[in-house]
Amino acid sequence: MKIVFWGTPSFAVPSLERLLREPDCEVLGVVTQPDKRRGRGNQLQPEAVKKVALAHNLPLWQPQRVKKDAATLADLRSLAADFFVVVAYGQILSPEILAMPRLGCINNHASLLPRYRGAAPIQWSLYNGETETGITTMLMDAGMDTGAMLLQRTLVVGLLENAEQVSQRLAELGADLVVETLRQQVVGQLQPIPQDNSQATYAPLIKKEDYGLDWHKSAIALQNQIRGFYPDCQTSLRGQPLKVSATLPLGSAYWSALPPEFQALAPQWTDERFAENHPPGSVIGLAKNLGPIIQTGAGGLLLLQVQPAGKRIQSGWDFVNGARLQIGEQLGLT
């Protein structure tokens, strides 16, 4: 099978590396996004897929707008590929591009389509508290994640897993599924299944305002927001920004889902304690060697990892000691 791979971030790397290892797959080249400026020096930095392509001496294209780049389109057409495999590329492909490969364009999408179409399916599925997510391969069409589905695999998600951790697991699952899809599709074993548009939901790009923590929300809603939009959710303390990147919801509804080392907190932090009259955002406890416990709109939230303004990421307990945090202080005050 002759393949052109399209992808950009680290999520796409396992799929590319898996294709490179397969004896019946010939990767003709890679299309990826242009280098971006980042870091303190604002230097141009290659994306993860480009690094892999260079390491394997693969032909590489980095068009600013692929559907407008005549030279890239001519090159791709001349390759006479069997498949284009697209994993988190970052640009919409035109009908002209979709028609180039002999057997179609296969997309690897990080959700159980038709749910969570769009740019951030992992993040929004965690934000919404989904306990299952997965990978779908599909035949691409001109819409955004609307193509006919080929194969799906499901992944169970733990209460404490964040978007980065789930992304890593889905990337590996997706790599296996891409190869399985290609092998079945090339011999005509797959029957594409049209998506039920009435069941579609969407996962748009995350906006700056999505990162703000509202302590009037329930502990579980905040937990899901923090792990979904990891590591960038933010509140404030003493008028200074405070990022929160790992938490633990406290309350009887969650004990069975927590690791054993945290279940020892159960006798101390009953539901009745969180029903007391504390303003949301208040520090209502200091769990030794763990971190501060914050009152929410429903239940308590233990802060396990934070990043104060101008400082490194630190444990909740280091934060308690470094900030000399006191019971009764309040987060989120402007």
Swiss-Prot record:
Source organism superkingdom: Bacteria
Pfam family, one: Formyl_trans_N
GO MF assignments: methionyl-tRNA formyltransferase activity
A GO cellular component annotation in the UniProt record: cytosol
Enzyme Commission number, as recorded: 2.1.2.9
Binding of (6S)-5,6,7,8-tetrahydrofolate, residues: 111-114
UniProtKB keywords: Protein biosynthesis, Transferase
Reactions the enzyme catalyzes: L-methionyl-tRNA(fMet) + (6R)-10-formyltetrahydrofolate = N-formyl-L-methionyl-tRNA(fMet) + (6S)-5,6,7,8-tetrahydrofolate + H(+)
Function: Attaches a formyl group to the free amino group of methionyl-tRNA(fMet). The formyl group appears to play a dual role in the initiator identity of N-formylmethionyl-tRNA by promoting its recognition by IF2 and preventing the misappropriation of this tRNA by the elongation apparatus.
Family: Belongs to the Fmt family.
NCBIfam families hit by this protein: fmt
Protein name per the record: Methionyl-tRNA formyltransferase
Organism: Cyanothece sp. (strain PCC 7425 / ATCC 29141)
